[in-house]
């Protein structure tokens, strides 16, 4: 799937309705899906970040990953359009499957 334009609000709300752990966040340069995953230690958080990286590489579509002690935050959006694309919804759902 090639990013072309952002999804409408209806699709975003439907996704959040079925994936309530995810949030839609808005920054000046982007609208994105965000979720923070919690772990008991840094090693688990880092391992999870690496697994998300594997998904990203397979799709050639890369999120922002923020790694802290016991937490990994994943933000999906299409940089080219500065918004959420259908591929971001799929990859966010794929990210959930890692847990």
For the regions a protein language model found, what residue spans apply to each?
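Single conserved hydrophobic/aromatic residue that forms the stacking wall/gate
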Residues: 1-11
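Short aromatic-glycine-(Arg/Gly/Cys) micro-motifs in beta-strand/loop hairpins
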Residues: 12-30
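Short, well-ordered beta-strand elements within core beta-sheets of diverse protein domains
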Residues: 32-40
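Short, conserved charged micro-motifs
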Residues: 43-47, 83-85
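Short amphipathic alpha-helices in soluble, non-transmembrane regions
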Residues: 48-52, 89-92
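Short arginine-rich
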Residues: 53-63
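Amphipathic, hydrophobic secondary-structure cores in small proteins
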Residues: 62-70
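C-terminal structural segments of small proteins and small subunits
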Residues: 75-98
């Amino acid at each position: 799937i090639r990013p072309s334009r952002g999804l409408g609000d209806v699709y975003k709300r439907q996704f959040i309705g079925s994936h309530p752990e995810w949030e839609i966040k808005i920054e000046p340069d982007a609208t994105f899906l965000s979720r923070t995953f919690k772990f008991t230690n840094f090693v688990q958080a880092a391992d999870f970040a690496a697994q998300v990286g594997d998904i990203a590489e397979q799709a050639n579509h890369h999120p922002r990953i923020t790694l802290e002690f016991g937490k990994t935050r994943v933000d999906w959006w299409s940089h080219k359009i500065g918004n959420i694309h259908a591929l971001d919804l799929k990859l966010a759902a794929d990210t959930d499957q890692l847990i």
